[in-house]
Amino acid sequence: MSENSTASHAAAMAAFKSLANNNTSSSSIPSSYKIPTSAESAKIRSPTPLNSNAAVPQNRPKRAATSVGVKSTTKPMAKSIATPISVKPSKANGFVSGVNKQRAPLPLARADSSLKSSRRYPQSKGLQASSSSSTMPKDMINSVKQSIESKSVGKDPSQKRISSLYEPQEMLKNLRSSISAKTVSGTSVRPMISEKNQAMINGIRDRIDSKRIVTDVSKTSSLSSEDVSHLQGHDLANTHTYQPLNNNDSFSSFGSSFSEVEPSSLSKANGEEDEESIIDNASATVQEHPPVNEEVAKNMNMDKTPKAKPKRRPPPDLVSGPREETSIPMFHDKSVESLPDGYSSTDADITLENDRNSSQSKFPQFPDIKKHKKTEKKGNFLKKYSRPLKCVDNEVNLLDSDEAEEEDETDSSYGKRAPQILTPPTQQVRLKSTMRKTNRRKEKKYMFNENKPWKNHNELSSISEQERKRYEGLWASNKGNYMNSVVTRLVGVDYDSGKSEPEVEEEEDSRKAARLSSKAGTFDSGKMSDQENFHGLLSVEVDQLIHGVVVRRIWKRSRLPRETLEAIWNLVDFRKDGTLNKPEFVVGMWLVDQCLYGRKLPKKVENEVWDSLGSIGLNVVVRKKGKR
């Protein structure tokens, strides 16, 4: 045992010395420490995991007997030098990943670690090619610097947008020097004009030149020297004297307005320009204008004021006829250049004088609105298919505007219509008493309901047949009670019916006339007699009366206040003897029921209530059909 341990220790020391010497060649390195090839290095760098399903490589390089993962054939050293480590084997896919390992000696372990750190595996051919093709970091830094320098602004101050002198004093000095240089040279810095801008300026110049020449030479050649001198001597500043001549309020259909000659509508500046243009055109030569300055051409659109568009002329059929007799109308805001041929500037004074003499002259209108009115057709359609309105004359069209009325007043010599006169309405105006329509359902709905009498007020001033029969039954059961015990004399009762009639003495005519005159009243005697007979004031039987005591006991059952019952008694008591006859008792009972319904007592019982009792005393039996 001791010999084997010494032999292994000697072998380990020899290996350690060989590793310590770096000058040894590759041939002196044992076969277990040879550098693997590229294929083997790739396998070593990317080992398969233990838990993966990949197969275990068969050509795995074998290490020396002293490596940790392989069991050494030699016997272990003493316990103080190396102690065995027991590791439980773990099987994964049939591969034993753990074996009994022995701890190597300390110098041998250090030599093995230094060897692993100094070991460099060569790269494959593909990796060497890629690394050789890529640039070094210095080259990359140089390329970045070159790109930055190419994009940077040069040192020339003309290329820089911001001055390098940021101090205010130096900036002011540079500004003053530049201003002084410009003033000395006398030239202003103008921006460079591109071809497109130059073409636009040339187009503006051409348009201005074309607008200055409006009329042909042939039109203005008819002007004589006298006309030109008259135009030069004409003063447009004193045109305010002709302002009241504008009395025409008519308008044409296409927006332009005819009016008499109104020099006041032309400004002085426009008039001067027109005179100059006429004089220039009279010379029959077109003057060439000098080139326009660039700044003037730029500001031409800003200074140009909007002018009125040239308006349409009237058609030739209306102008060609009475052209020589009538004055030529002028449009508002219109220059002399747009006037027709053969017109001279002296015609304006002639027309002004004629207008002073005849202020009623009116100009013809175009088109004739009276002949082409669409509202008339619409009016005829309404007349045919619509009802005529009351209090409105159907011949008058209410849809015409105020302008049409003004046009009728300002009719020309071409045609005049007689003024239309409003005719009075043929039928008398009848107003409806109400706009509501009668509905039978509503009438049936609002009929009197005895269970809800407060909802209807129909027939409140009359006693119904049903109510009258009920009150008469109550009177029949209580009439004549306690009448034999009455001590006072009753009105209309004949107490002397059993005694002999007194003899009638003859009276003189004078006494008889005096007695009749004293009894004569303001009321009609027939009317008074009917009322007396109705209330039983002249003649009545005792059995047909009801005592006041009985009436009080009956009315008290209604539980109305005593004052209300007293007011009802006063309304129906015409006898003034403490009794009531049949009509008075029935009306009193009806008033009690009305108070129970919530109606207020009237100040006087109306005659309609008394008239509703006209059939009292008639016993008529009404039989229905089919019954015998």
UniProtKB/Swiss-Prot annotation:
SUPFAM superfamilies named in the record? EF-hand
In the record, biological process GO terms are:
endocytosis; lipid metabolic process
PROSITE patterns, sorted: EH (PS50031)
User: Which spans does this entry mark as compositional bias, Low complexity?
Assistant: 21-38, 253-267
Q: Where is the composition biased (Basic residues)?
A: 370-380
* Entry keyword set: Lipid metabolism
Which InterPro entries does the record associate with it? EF-hand-dom_pair, EH_dom
Cellular compartments per GO CC: cytoplasm; plasma membrane
Where is each EH domain found?
527-616
| Pfam families in UniProt | EH
Record field: compositional bias (Acidic residues): 400-411
Q: Where is the composition biased (Basic and acidic residues)?
A: 322-336
**Region feature (Disordered):** 21-83, 107-138, 253-276, 297-380, 398-421, 497-527
What is this protein for, i.e. what is its function?
Positive regulator of phosphatidylinositol 4,5-bisphosphate turnover and negatively regulates signaling through the cell integrity pathway. Involved in rDNA silencing.
Q: Which family does it belong to?
A: Belongs to the IRS4 family.
Q: What is this protein called?
A: Increased rDNA silencing protein 4
